[in-house]
């Protein structure tokens, strides 16, 4: 439907959990794409927008990249002005569930003196069909149903627990040095252990209230009945789709256990 039209696409991606899957959507589109990295307010202020744009430039050829926080109204006006400048009469707004699509649309409505009444939710399928939203005589948004990723943690975690794990405020990274045969446990969801001969430095970017427990891994059976994934990485990010990510500093030989290994992906280091 979208490719059959000549309308441009505003594609929203959650900055925290950028992945190959989320960026592969761009390859399926023949339209002009404005790539919008959302939820900027969750990352530390020390992370510059220019750094995020540089990171994206190494992953996609898209030149129109915007970094926004709809909640804080950072970058939204800039994007709106660009759409008007380019004479975009009508654009599709697309994105995965929890990408911040509805919050973004509500902010544009309010900027144009209208009530922001689009339903926002962290759960899939809030929008069931395409909705035309006229901002003004110059621009109409076509709100589309959110994509539901088969790799999202949402698919494997109890709904009420999942909602409690979603970050709502600036994330304070938690740094751990893990010795060989030690591990970090994230609730009943995730276990990561160091099999390297050297110490491993891991930086966790998750909701601040999430408790991380460090303990010995030898003879510890916690989560060992779950899906297992072994990785050897160097200066990479390990993403838990929809929840956050772990930055691996230097080389690491790691074993992970989680509810479903689809939840885990590895990407080039973002920060």
Residue ranges and their predicted role:
Residues 42-99, 105-121:
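Canonical P-loop GTPase G-domain recognition
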Residues 10, 34-35, 66, 92:
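A structural signal for isolated positions on well-ordered beta-strands in alpha/beta enzyme cores
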Residues 103, 107, 168-171:
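Short amphipathic alpha-helical patches
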Residues 101-102, 143:
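Conserved long hydrophobic alpha-helices within structured protein cores
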Residues 1-9, 13-25, 30-34, 40, ...:
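Helix-rich effector regions associated with P-loop NTPase G domains
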